[in-house]
A protein has these predicted regions:
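Structural microenvironment flanking redox-active thiols in thiol-disulfide oxidoreductases
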Residues: 61-100, 110-115
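Short active-site neighborhood of thiol/selenol oxidoreductases, capturing the structured segment around
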Residues: 40-60
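A short beta-strand-turn-helix
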Residues: 28-47, 115
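Alpha/beta-hydrolase fold active-site loops
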Residues: 46-47, 78, 124
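Bacterial N-terminal signal peptides that target proteins for export
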Residues: 2-13
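C-terminal motif of bacterial Sec signal peptides marking the signal peptidase cleavage site
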Residues: 22-23
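Thiol/disulfide oxidoreductase modules built on the thioredoxin-like
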Residues: 98-102, 108-153
Length: 158
């Protein structure tokens, strides 16, 4: 009987260790649609991280440009990611994203610490992160599709 308990105990330890390792994976919480977003799911891609707020008029006019950029980046190992400056969560985040007609992923948790992004008090602000996770550019103010495409192309050296 003692041998059987040891086997069960070892199995429990292995399961607990696996659960702990899984729980340690960095998580950005659910996006505006309730889908979990992990840091691992974003690794190895170029990221265009845009901070926006409902009270920011230039943010509102910039969103269609970012929606268009997200569409052009499909199948290119690059994504547009939004972050609400006011840290809205859950239904509030969904309502705000819907009111702006945001079609790209909006994170519930700020990725600033993971990517070492400086806090900006001016909006909109957009960061371009390379596929190694390094900040390559900080862009202040309203961006255009053409401007972002040109900047990404130049940074990639294409």
């Amino acid at each position: 009987m003692g041998l059987g308990l040891r086997k069960v105990g070892k199995a429990v330890l292995v399961i607990c260790a696996g659960l702990l390792l899984t729980a340690c994976a960095e998580d950005f919480g659910p996006d505006q649609h309730g889908r979990k977003v992990t840091a691992d799911s974003l690794d190895g891609q170029w990221l265009i991280i845009n901070y926006w707020a409902e009270w920011c008029a230039p943010c509102r006019t910039e969103i269609p440009e970012l929606n268009a950029l997200e569409e052009t980046l499909k199948n290119q190992s690059a994504r547009v990611i939004g972050v609400n400056f006011d840290a809205l969560q859950g239904d509030d985040l969904k309502r705000a994203a819907d009111s702006f007609d945001i079609r790209f992923t909006v994170l519930a948790q700020d990725p600033a610490e993971r990517y070492d992004l400086p806090r900006s008090e001016a909006l909109p602000v957009t960061y371009i992160i390379d596929d190694k996770g390094k900040v390559r550019e900080q862009l202040m103010g309203e961006q255009t599709l053409e401007g972002l495409q040109a900047k990404i192309k130049a940074l990639k050296g294409a």
